Amino acid sequence: MRVWIDADACPRAAKDQVVKFALKRQFEVVLVAGQSQIKPSFSCVKLIVVPSGPDAADDYLVEHAVPGELVICSDVPLADRLVKNGVTALDPRGKEFSPANMSERLAVRNLFTDLREQGQMGGGPPPHGEKEKQAFANALDRILTRLMRQA
């Protein structure tokens, strides 16, 4: 079992939660980043820094993650590519990406992108608070249990 993390955009709290689960459940965590990151010093965690470039980390994740593995990402177009490949994807707020919700998630993402470009809306998502941390931990537990049963 392996959990991949799009490390450049993932909140530290979510990364830490995945590592905590990995230590308990004995699986590998792979952080994929476009820039150097601080890697937790556990043998179950690997860091892969990809060459810089647009979507380099995304492309790496799509090429290397396989069905039965989980990718943590907040990038909706990346999640769409992963889900189309049969890979499970979860955002750091605890919402699972699925074939059933991808078109809606892409439409919302595109709407917010358009509104930001028109200056009608501010930057990124709200802060990653306790509610989001708990929702992520619950979803992570549920998905890991499901994937480990399927293995």
Swiss-Prot record:
It holds the Pfam family DUF188. InterPro entries: UPF0178. It comes from the Bacteria. Belongs to the UPF0178 family. This is UPF0178 protein PFLU_5917. It comes from Pseudomonas fluorescens (strain SBW25).
